[in-house]
UniProtKB/Swiss-Prot annotation:
Residues 186-279 are annotated as: immunoglobulin-like. Gene3D superfamilies: Na, k-atpase alpha subunit. The gene is ATP1B3. It comes from Homo sapiens. This is Sodium/potassium-transporting ATPase subunit beta-3. Disulfide bonds join 128-144, 154-170, 191-250.
């Protein structure tokens, strides 16, 4: 058969059948059983070796890690600040005192966040001495109680609406946890209004003080039940300020090793949020 002649359909099918299985040589897809066995054995050994090498490498790496304390912590020398309730958009709170549905989500978020701080939830925690670092050697680490009454009007104990129904909303501020952090001096969270005509910003506890007894923190697995100290900010809107946007800035102060100013991170140790209360 010349190159220009086309194979018939039967010839093509016969060649394909012969390629798939050749009864004369016993080949399957062009290879004998021995050839297929050697190939499968090679890939089994090859990929088995790769899997074993990967597993061994991971095991060696995991031996260098501590399951309770992160190995590298020097990249986070100073904590940032977070606010609650969680704002719907960016760091802006907007509500109407006459419309409970506008702030119902804020109240629910605050109640959920403060649940671990209730007296019932803290009954198994330790009453720690005030004014000094509470250093522990382990292996058992206890957590200090944080009296929710320190938040006063923003504790939710006497006002389940956290001031929103009266136009005096509460915002909770806390520092991020850093394992082993030992603040110096008398740390506090200072919160002020950036609006000169709205000076009435109350901070609880008094002056936003943070007791040293809540430091150091030993990690989630070791320091079971640990409660972060909180600071509450309450902005009081006068009737003539209804509908006006108020900007509040909170920053860490009073401690030499806790930064609130950094050229590379303008949010280090500080947070700024906006509140708009409508009638």
């Amino acid at each position: 058969m010349t190159k220009n002649e086309k194979k018939s359909l039967n010839q093509s099918l016969a060649e394909w059948k012969l390629f798939i299985y050749n009864p004369t040589t016993g080949e399957f897809l062009g290879r004998t059983a021995k050839s297929w066995g050697l190939i499968l054995l090679f890939y089994l050994v090859f990929y088995g070796f790769l899997a074993a090498l990967f597993s061994f490498t991971m095991w060696v790496m995991l031996q260098t890690l501590n399951d309770e304390v992160p190995k590298y912590r020097d990249q986070i020398p100073s904590p940032g600040l977070m606010v609650f309730p969680k704002p719907v958009t960016a760091l802006e709170y907007t509500f109407s005192r006459s419309d409970p549905t506008s702030y119902a989500g804020y109240i629910e978020d605050l109640k959920k966040f403060l649940k671990p701080y209730t007296l019932e939830e803290q009954k198994n925690l330790t009453v720690c001495p005030d004014g000094a670092l509470f250093e522990q050697k382990g292996p058992v680490y206890v957590a200090c109680q944080f009296p929710i009454s320190l938040l006063q009007a923003c504790s939710g104990m006497n006002d389940p609406d956290f001031g929103y129904s009266q136009g005096n909303p509460c915002i909770l501020v806390k520092m991020n946890r850093i394992i082993g952090l030992k603040p110096e001096g008398v740390p506090r969270i200072d919160c002020v209004s950036k609006n000169e005509d709205i000076p009435n910003v109350a901070v609880y506890p008094h002056n936003g003080m943070i007791d040293l007894k809540y430091f150091p923190y030993y990690g989630k697995k070791l320091h079971v039940g640990y409660l972060q100290p909180l600071v509450a900010v309450q902005v009081s809107f006068a009737p003539n300020n209804t509908g006006k946007e108020v900007t509040v800035e909170c920053k860490i102060d009073g401690s030499a090793n806790l930064k609130s100013q950094d050229d590379r991170d303008k949010f280090l140790g500080r947070v700024m949020f906006k509140i708009t209360a409508r009638a």
